Each structure stands twice: as structure tokens, then as C-alpha cells.
Amino acid sequence: MEINKLNARILSKFGESGAVFGVGALELVKDYPELLILSADMSMVAGLERFKNTYPDHFFNTGIAEQNLIGMSAGLVSENRKVVVVAQACFISMRSFEQIRQYCGYMKFPLIIVGINAGFSLTFMGNTHYAIEDMGIIRCIPGMTIISPSDAGQALKAFYASWTLNKPVYIRFTGGLNCPVIYEQEFNYQIGKGIRLREGNQIQIIATGSMVDRALKAAKILEEKGISVDVVDMHTIKPLDTDILKKDVKLVVSVEEHSIIGGLG
């Protein structure tokens, strides 16, 4: 799908997970019958209801049992199925660490693990549902790619790109429905290559996920005060694009909905 102003706003209403599973997965399964989606009781929350009802043989709900979810998914991958795993970011990263470490880090099974409601998306449920350590936890596992999309359109592109990568990937989604639109026209997306959204020579703001929108708003305020700001959308946390950071500025600021330890910062 090419991004334009109209579909960018439609995808925004779905949210990142809704765009991926309500649009992307429905398209992929037509060409890739080996696609399976396993969920820890997240079909409604993740926007999977349409996929589940349309392709019931391609969807399995393991219940709220994240360790079992990864184990079952790994078994299916060993039988040449392509598996997408969906669960809350806080639980899939912490409860399933040993299983992800074993099957993705050491056995190199190319699971696509999607952690929804990352960051502070579920603050109303208390700190048990915060996910501000998930990238740091998974980042230390060998061979993992970590992606943090900034809007729903980019989430869709990240999902498609992960599909062809044939490596274990963790994609974290922050925010919910009606997420801010960063990209209103088609753009080049490549895993491991950050995107410069604004050119500047005094301050560089490097942001990821939901904080990209905040970074752009901050840059606009600073520009009005005569301060030149460079803004980078660092959608891939691992591998990190160090080339885009090579800019002569006076101050570099990182912004993320995650601990700076093990995250972008």
C-alpha cells in the first residue's frame, strides 16, 4: 500500500495494531497461505477480529499464557509455517524472555513478535501494564531486530518489511486508536535506516515511536524561537542507524516512551 493523505488518516483511526492486523495481515495471507497468527487473548484489542473471522484456520488464541504462546509458535515455525505472535508488550517481553532467548536468539527461528500497548499506553491499568523496559530486555538477545514505528502507516510498512526479513523481529506498538499521522505521503522505509523529518544545525532530536510526534511539535516551538532543529525518526532500535546521527550540532536529545537504559537513549 502506498501512503497518501487519505489512507494515512484512515490507518490512524485503526491505530498501529489495527492497521497491521486489520489491513496488512488480511492482504499477506492471500499470497502467503503459510501465515499464522497466534495471540494471547488479544484479538479484540489488537484489531484481529476480522482476520480471525475471515481466516479461522490461520488464527489461534493461546489464552493469557505468553510462554506457551512462544513455545507453540516456535513449534509451528519448525514445521515451515510463518508465525506472527501478538501479546501485550509488557508481558511478552518479561514473561517470555527465556523462550524468546532460546528459540529466536539461539535457534534463530524467524518469529515476528508484536508487542501492543507499549510504553505508557495502559496507564489506567496501573504499573503492572507499563512497558518501558521491553526493548532493553529483548535487545540483548542475539540476532533480534527491534522496530518502534512512529505512526500507523509506518507500522504497516514495518510489518511488510519484517515479513521478508526472515529473521526474528520484535515490533512494539505505542498508543491506541486515532494515533497522530507522521507520514501523509509515500516514503521510503527500510529496516535499520532512520528517517530525517526536519533539517537543522543547532539541536538534533532523535525520537522513536509515539514520541516522534512530540519531537516534531517541540521542534516547531524551538524554530519559532530562532533555534534550528534536526528531527530524526529512529524507527529501528536494533540495528541502530549510526550514520544518520553523524551531524555537527550543539546538542543531541533522545526522546522515547521507554527507559533510556537499553532503549534509544
Give the role of each language-model region.
Residues 1-172, 177, 188, ...:
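Thiamine diphosphate
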